Every structure is written in structure tokens, then in C-alpha cells.
Curated annotation (Swiss-Prot):
GO BP terms in the entry: mRNA processing; NAD-cap decapping; nuclear-transcribed mRNA catabolic process
Cofactor note: Divalent metal cation.
Description of how the protein assembles with itself and partners: Interacts with RAT1; the interaction is direct, stabilizes RAT1 protein structure and stimulates its exoribonuclease activity. The interaction also stimulates RAI1 pyrophosphohydrolase activity, probably by recruiting it to mRNA substrates.
Gene Ontology MF annotations: exonuclease activity; metal ion binding; mRNA 5'-diphosphatase activity; nucleotide binding; RNA binding
Name of protein: Decapping nuclease RAI1
Protein role: Decapping enzyme for NAD-capped RNAs: specifically hydrolyzes the nicotinamide adenine dinucleotide (NAD) cap from a subset of RNAs by removing the entire NAD moiety from the 5'-end of an NAD-capped RNA. The NAD-cap is present at the 5'-end of some RNAs and snoRNAs. In contrast to the canonical 5'-end N7 methylguanosine (m7G) cap, the NAD cap promotes mRNA decay. Also acts as a non-canonical decapping enzyme that removes the entire cap structure of m7G capped or incompletely capped RNAs and mediates their subsequent degradation.
Organism: Eremothecium gossypii (strain ATCC 10895 / CBS 109.51 / FGSC 9923 / NRRL Y-1056)
Subcellular location per the Swiss-Prot or TrEMBL entry: Nucleus
One Pfam assignment: RAI1
Keywords assigned: Exonuclease, Hydrolase, Metal-binding, mRNA processing, Nuclease, Nucleotide-binding, Nucleus, RNA-binding
PANTHER family per UniProt: DECAPPING AND EXORIBONUCLEASE PROTEIN, DOM-3 RELATED
GO cellular component: cytosol; nucleus
Residues binding substrate, per UniProt: F105, R106, G107, E215, K237, Q261
């Protein structure tokens, strides 16, 4: 008999109790599979003075030379390997298994929440594996979808402008360590999106704990070499300058989306660059993640943030009701969204369950050795 379960999208948990996110580790990754745990070499630093903003930066400049390494690479963009390597290093330091119910990337959890607030149902297509008393979630697709339109098209320039803004607003090193010629030539540098820096955070809602991996755009002020840097991270976004009612509605939706993205892992600061129809940067504004729900109070999304937390609690509780057996009791499920509900269906795919696509062999062996060391 095949196990199946569903959760209606209008379901909500009464509680909005949240656990304070805490950084467990971080890693740097490049296209091609290069990955360095507890390494900040790909961490960037925010620096965009008013004098630069006043130059009306063209966020479409250089699109033809854009090195879209993520789109061109053959990498498995849904792989949990970097997250699990960082988690393994954390467990090695602590000599114990991390206390968590769900392990996933922020992007997957965001999709699960967003599907109840106008997100595309097709965005929810995931595998859930029960292993060692925990649930591991990854995207079913190994490759993200990237724009296929011509580089001079509006759709492609809208996609590119976000990366261009990051290139103009971020430095590879703190500004005090950056040569003047580098600062002055940022506008001429070719934009590329291969190198990434990711944080691994433990958080929770209601009675359940999650470990989430998430890409970080950069540091806003300074980095603490031995501390938790969540309070120093910043998220960058580009939005169209608000001039019409439609612009305002779109911006409110974007604010809700970025709040959800940052709230999930405890990033406290958002910087949004406002552009015109020709992708010229007109202004830059800083937002506190905690203040965004207050800003949305006077809009059509007045209750969206609290409602999202209640839905987050409901879906997490539902997932954690899945049977979670001992170390070698693997159970595999497909998670999807359709007809106003989330659906879980058990799979009997031994190749997928025993392969490295979801939980690699080296992580399974690590957990076995950890279990034996505690049992001896």
C-alpha cells in the first residue's frame, strides 16, 4: 500500500512561535563543483556611496558579455552536498548529531510557503527523504530554469539587472582593503554569477526545528571572524521605480517575497535599488526585515506576513508527521502542489533512495559512525 497525504493550502497553525535563527556554518562554492566548507572566500562586502548612485548607473550595461555561469554549467543546482558537508563539519565539532527535524535549502521552504500566497504550484516539485530520524528535502529538478530569450530582450535585461546591481554594490574585499582602481572600474567589469557564498542556519517554528542552507549576497558592515554573522548579512534586490498603481502592487508583492526570503534565515537588512523603464538606477533604499510587515499593514497584504508564519507552522507540522524510522530505514516521498493542496506520495525507487542525489553515501557513513561512537 502506497502512503499518501495532503495538506490544504488554507490550513493554518494557531501559533506563530518562532525560534531565533542561529548560524551553524558557511561555505563557498563555484561552478564545476568546487566547494570549501567554513571558507569565506566568496563572501562580498556592500559598498555603494551616494556619489555612485547619483551617476545613474545603467543596470543593462554589459548584458551581452554577461558570464551566466549558473545557466551554462552542468551542475546539479538542487544538490544538498554543500549543505551536508557543512553540517557534517558542525557535527564533528560538536561530537553529536544536529538537533533538527527538517534539513533543506531556504529556496524549497520558501516555495512551499509561497504556493499558498499566489506562487506557482509547479514550483513545488521536491523529494523528501526520511533518514536517521530527520527529513531531507531537495528539488526534484537538477537544473534551475534560466531565461532563454535574446540578451537584448526586456525579459533578459530584467534578469541581468539584478546581477549588475550586485556587481556595482558589492566588493570582493572590505572597502578599506580594496585598491582605488578597483573601486573606480566596477562599472567596466564583466558580470558573472558563478561564485557563491552560503550560510547554514538552524531555525524553527512551533515545536519543530529546521536546518536551512541559503545563499548570502554580502556583508553590510563588517564580518566577525569567530561569531554568528547573520546580523551582518544583507540581501540585495532591484525593483522598478513606483509610479503607477500597478507598480505599487508589484512592489508590495516583491516586499513580501523578500521578507519571506530573509525572515526564514534571520537576515535583518534588505537594500533595494529602484530602476526606471530603461534599467537606469534612480535611487537606493534600505529596509529592515522586521519592519516590512508594518509597511505592508496599509496594503492589500496587510495580514500576509502573520498568515505566512501560521502556514509555515502548519506545513512544517504536517511534514514532521511523516514516519521517521531509525538510521537505515529510508523512506522516500514526492512532494507536489495541485488542486489547492500540498501532496505527499511515497515512492519505491531503490536507485534514487540508495543513490547520492539526495543523501550521499559519505554522509550516511558519517551518521553511522557518529551513532556508533555514541553507542559505544
Amino acid at each position: 500500500m502506497v502512503f499518501e497525504s495532503e495538506l490544504l493550502l488554507q490550513r493554518r497553525l494557531a501559533t506563530t512561535a518562532l525560534k531565533q535563527p542561529k548560524e551553524l556554518g558557511y561555505y563557498s562554492t563555484n561552478v564545476g563543483g568546487e566547494l570549501k566548507v567554513m571558507d569565506e572566500s566568496n563572501l562580498s562586502y556592500y559598498y555603494l556611496p551616494d556619489a555612485d548612485i547619483e551617476k545613474h548607473i545603467d543596470l543593462s550595461a554589459g548584458a551581452r558579455k554577461f558570464q551566466d555561469e549558473q545557466a551554462e554549467a552542468e551542475d546539479d543546482t538542487g544538490s544538498l552536498h554543500g549543505l551536508l558537508q557543512t553540517l557534517m563539519e558542525y557535527e564533528r565539532r560538536k561530537s553529536k548529531k544536529v538537533n533538527a527535524d527538517i534539513i533543506a535549502f531556504r529556496g524549497q521552504v520558501k516555495r512551499l510557503i509561497h504556493c499558498a500566497f499566489g506562487g506557482h504550484a509547479t514550483d513545488v516539485d521536491m523529494y523528501v527523504m526520511s533518514f536517521d530520524g530527520q527529513l531531507f528535502i531537495r528539488a526534484a529538478r537538477k537544473k534551475l530554469e534560466f531565461p532563454t530569450s535574446p540578451r537584448e530582450s526586456w525579459a533578459y535585461l530584467a534578469y541581468y539587472s539584478g546581477y549588475k546591481f550586485e556587481r556595482m554594490a558589492l566588493l570582493d574585499r572590505p572597502v578599506a582593503e580594496t585598491p582605488r582602481e578597483v573601486l573606480e572600474s566596477r562599472g567596466k567589469q564583466v558580470v558573472r554569477n558563478g561564485p557563491q557564498y552560503k550560510t547554514v542556519v538552524r531555525t524553527g517554528v512551533g515545536e519543530h526545528k529546521l536546518v536551512l542552507g541559503a545563499e548570502v549576497d554580502g556583508i553590510f558592515d563588517f564580518r566577525e571572524p569567530t561569531g554568528d554573522n547573520l546580523k551582518h548579512y544583507v540581501e540585495l534586490k532591484v525593483a522598478k521605480k513606483v509610479q503607477t498603481l500597478k507598480d505599487a502592487t508589484n512592489f508590495e508583492q516583491k516586499l513580501f517575497s523578500v521578507w519571506l526570503q530573509c525572515f526564514l534565515v534571520g537576515i535583518n537588512r534588505v537594500i533595494i535599488g529602484f530602476r526606471d523603464e530603461k534599467f537606469v538606477l534612480k535611487s537606493v533604499e534600505e529596509f529592515s526585515t522586521s519592519e516590512i510587515p508594518l509597511l505592508l499593514k496599509s496594503t492589500g497584504l496587510r495580514n500576509a506576513c502573520v498568515d505566512a508564519i501560521k502556514w509555515y507552522g502548519a506545513l512544517t507540522k504536517w511534514l514532521c508527521e511523516l514516519p521517521r524510522g531509525p538510521e537505515d530505514d529510508f523512506k522516500l516521498y514526492r512532494l507536489s502542489c495541485s488542486r489547492g493542496a500540498l501532496h505527499l506520495r511515497q515512492l519505491h525507487d531503490e536507485d534514487l533512495a540508495n543513490g547520492d542525489d539526495i543523501i550521499p553515501g559519505w554522509f550516511r557513513e558519517w551518521r553511522r559512525s557518529l551513532s556508533k561512537s555514541h553507542g559505544s
